[in-house]
Amino acid sequence: MKKIKIAAGLAHVDYGHLADIVKEVTEAGAEYIHSDAADMHDLKNMQLMGGHQIIEGIRSHTDKPIECHIYTKTCDLLFIEKLAQVGTNMLILPAEHFIGAPLAYIINWCRERSMKVGLTIGLYTPLSFIEESIYDIDRLHIVVHGVDETDGKDNWGWRSSCLD
C-alpha cells in the first residue's frame, strides 16, 4: 500500500506567525511545505502572494522539502534563480500556461539548480496538454478547486478561464 504524503499549504495562514506555523506542521509530520506565488491575473482572490521572500523566511525553520506552486502566466530564469537560492526544492507550474519549448527550458533551468518540477492541470484540461512532458516532470497535480467565490459559478478553479 502506498503511503500518503501530506503537504502543509501556506496560502491561508497568518503571515505574522509563519515561522511558528512551519515549525508546528513540521513537528506534526508534514512531509512537504507547500508555498504559493500568485500574480494579479490568475488568482484574483489572492493577488500578489508568496514567492521567494516567503520561502527565504521559512527555510531555516524546517528541514522538509519546500515546493513553490506558481499561479502566473510567466516564469523566467531570474524567478527560478531566486527560488533556488532560497532553498526551494520543487517548482510547480500550471500546464495550461507552460507547454512546449518554454516548459522544456524551465525544466532544464530547474534541473541545473537541483530543483524538481511539477505540473498542475485543471480538471477540464485535456491530458494531451501534458503528453510531451509527462516523463520529464516529478509530479502531476490534478486541480479540482471548488466554487470560485468571485463570481459564484461552479467553474472548478482558477484555470477554467484558460480554456474558454
Regions found by a protein language model. Give the residues of each.
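Short, aromatic/basic amphipathic alpha-helical patches
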Residues: 106
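Internal catalytic-core helix/loop-beta-alpha segment
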Residues: 116-121
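Structured N-terminal alpha/beta-domain signature
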Residues: 90-93, 109
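Short, acidic/turn-prone active-site loops that include or flank metal/cofactor-
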Residues: 95-99, 144-149
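A glycine-rich beta-strand to alpha-helix segment
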Residues: 123-126
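Conserved N-terminal beta1-alpha1 strand-loop-helix module at the mouth
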Residues: 1-88, 98-101, 111, 130-138, ...
